[in-house]
Amino acid sequence: MKYYKTKIKRIFDKENKVLGHANGEFVPNGRFYFDRIRKDEIIEDAPVFDYFHLQSFDKRKFWEWRLQDVHGFIGIFPMFCIWYISDKLKSLLEKFRIAPKYHFYETRLLYKEEKFKYWIFQFPIGGFHNYNYEKSEYFIDNERILGIKTAEEYDEYDYKIWKETKKNIEWRKIVLIDKFDIVDTWQGDILCSERLKQAIEENGIVGFEFFEIDYEVVAE
């Protein structure tokens, strides 16, 4: 399965504008719920979070200049959630094997005095446990790192290396235990399978950019 790095399109040079992102500062009890989501809790009985609004670092009059199927977050929101998505995109994602664990939270987005149904996409939860660390290939100073078996061991080693040397571990091959259409990586990339990328483009989903990656990703 081929993967692409995917990013939210945020900067528009031709229009000289930046994308507005979702701020949940007006959601009742939002901080309480968002903190629980931040800690990877799945809240099955969460209320509809009403409402978010778009905001950017540009002038206020440009906050709502563009609406996409995917936005990021700003201000008050559940930390570590990175996609705020339209109902159309949610329906598409549900047709795929998204991630080992994930959840959608229904919200309302106030946009140009009208409310739209948007969703907080809580993902991936525990995605790094889907890695085979013994078969994956990652290096420091061109020397392959061996002996790591779990996500916790890798995280501890990564922190130690950064603290002592300020160097990043270089990944050359990710081996996944199971196949999913969205993969998070230790280097910060969010990967999208070729078939999901194709479906996004064919269904006119607006807001993503896709890039080739310079490392290998395989599933056992």
Where are these regions (language model features)?
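Phosphate/anion-contacting hairpin/loop surfaces
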Residues: 1-220
